[in-house]
């Protein structure tokens, strides 16, 4: 016989909330689950090429490894300035 009162409370109709909307219900140990991305707005499932850039991480990576960035004109000016200094 399993011990009583050691298991968490089970919510069979837990709401999954994304951007303030209830997107689905599922079973969970919490009554509400707040998510940033789910299959309804994920680029892989929607077929869109949207970069979810949180706190400029993509731009920092692009600048660090010289792969261009959103401000490609600025990076071109910087390269030209470095070449003229030589």
Swiss-Prot record:
One example GO MF annotation: rRNA binding
Keywords: Ribonucleoprotein, Ribosomal protein, RNA-binding, rRNA-binding
Keyword RNA-binding: yes
Biased composition (Basic and acidic residues): 77-86
UniProt keyword annotation of rRNA-binding present: yes
Record-level GO BP terms: translation
Transmembrane segments: none
InterPro entries, sorted: Ribosomal_bL28/bL31-like_sf (IPR034704), Ribosomal_bL31 (IPR002150), Ribosomal_bL31_A (IPR027491), Ribosomal_bL31_sf (IPR042105)
Region of interest (Disordered), ranges: 66-86
GO cellular component labels: ribonucleoprotein complex; ribosome
PROSITE patterns documented for this protein: RIBOSOMAL_L31
Signal peptide: none
Protein family (similarity comment): Belongs to the bacterial ribosomal protein bL31 family. Type A subfamily.
Function: Binds the 23S rRNA.
Subunit relationships: Part of the 50S ribosomal subunit.
Protein name, per record: Large ribosomal subunit protein bL31
Organism, scientific name: Prochlorococcus marinus (strain MIT 9515)
Taxonomic lineage of the native organism: Bacteria, Bacillati, Cyanobacteriota, Cyanophyceae, Synechococcales
């Amino acid at each position: 016989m399993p011990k009583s009162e050691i298991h968490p409370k089970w919510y069979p109709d837990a709401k999954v909330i994304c951007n303030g909307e209830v997107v689905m219900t599922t079973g969970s140990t919490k009554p509400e689950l707040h998510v940033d991305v789910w299959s309804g707005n994920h680029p892989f499932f929607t077929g869109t090429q949207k970069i979810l850039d949180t706190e400029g991480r993509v731009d920092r990576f692009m600048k660090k490894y010289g792969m261009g960035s959103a401000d490609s004109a600025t990076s071109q000016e910087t390269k030209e300035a470095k070449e003229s200094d030589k």
